[in-house]
Amino acid sequence: NLKQLTLYAFSQENWKRPKREINLLMKLLKEFLIKERKEIEENNIRLTAIGRIDGLPEDIQRELAISIEESKYNTGMVLCLALNYGGRSEIVDAAKEEITEETFKNFLYTSEMPDPDLLIRTGGEMRVSNFLLWEISYTEIWVTPICWPEFRKEHLEEAIKDYAHRERRFGGLRE
């Protein structure tokens, strides 16, 4: 069972895309937030978000806040949407505080989340695209040629099955 799933839904770099595409992505996000509230509640999922949320359109911020508030007491899987997110921005925002290596994670957007065990990279791209740069230092990566809009439950199951057969060493040697 997954305890935490973070979806890189919209990067800061995505603002460079054509306005028409951005508008479509925001429309899809808003529809998702409204349409999936019931399913999120029925499945006891807690919704969270990371990124520079205040840079999103006001209607998206409002719908996101409603979805987060309505699910905040759910105790099942945590579904985190990375929105207007950039790994470098996260590090810069965290570094604005007086920090040590021990306290650095406390200032990240993801401070209350565990580091990811598995990163699923869609679209066949062999790069991390400015995503969770601090947090994925020992994350296993699974790359699929399937693009995000076509990614389905069976693809997720395939990734998890592959991950289950890996030996995680966190920088150590094989046993």
Where are these regions (language model features)?
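Flexible, compositionally biased loop and terminal segments
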Residues: 1-175
